[in-house]
């Protein structure tokens, strides 16, 4: 079993990528004091998390000054792969709590990570996540699959000719 983490008041919370568009690997990273936790995510998870955080924050009072977008510390290796994400708001502590569960086989028990972050930190996370997702390859206007710089075999054209852009 992987290691579980509980960081009730993170100093830094960010999402980031390693690699070029089309070959990027997405990560979420949190730190509290000297402790850094890096977890691997899917692009769709980053997109969903960013969208949900935006909707969640819209229902709360406006956050204060947003911290500068934190860069991913690529020297810290990923500990495990994210399976499910959950969010809650602790009104007493004025913290958004991210609960992340490890992706494991059905019969296995996975690790859990809990990150408590300020509204400002999660607002910055939502913005950065949306920017990273948008920075990927543009979608094909016909099929929606990503367009590669070296070409695109579009299923809507049976792969015979590239779509006219």
Model-derived regions, located:
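Short alpha-helical interface patches
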Residues: 47, 51, 91-95, 119-123, ...
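Intrinsic, low-complexity N-terminal interaction/targeting segments
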Residues: 1-20, 25-26, 64-112, 116
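Short cysteine/histidine-rich metal-coordination sites, predominantly Zn2+-binding motifs
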Residues: 154-165
């Amino acid at each position: 079993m992987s290691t579980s983490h509980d960081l009730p008041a993170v100093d830094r919370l960010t999402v980031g990528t390693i690699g070029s568009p089309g070959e990027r690997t997405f990560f979420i990273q949190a730190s509290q004091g000297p402790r850094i936790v890096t977890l691997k995510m899917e692009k769709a998870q980053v997109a969903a998390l960013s969208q949900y955080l935006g909707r969640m924050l819209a229902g709360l009072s406006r956050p204060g000054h947003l911290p500068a977008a934190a860069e991913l510390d690529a020297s810290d290796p990923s500990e495990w792969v994210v399976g499910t994400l959950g969010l809650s708001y602790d009104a007493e502590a004025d913290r958004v709590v991210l609960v992340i569960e490890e992706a494991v086989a059905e019969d296995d028990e996975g690790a859990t990570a809990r990150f408590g972050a300020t509204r400002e930190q999660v607002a910055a996370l939502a913005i950065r996540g949306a920017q990273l997702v948008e920075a990927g390859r543009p979608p094909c206007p016909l099929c929606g699959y990503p367009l590669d710089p070296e070409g695109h075999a579009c299923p809507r054209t049976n792969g015979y000719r590239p779509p006219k852009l």
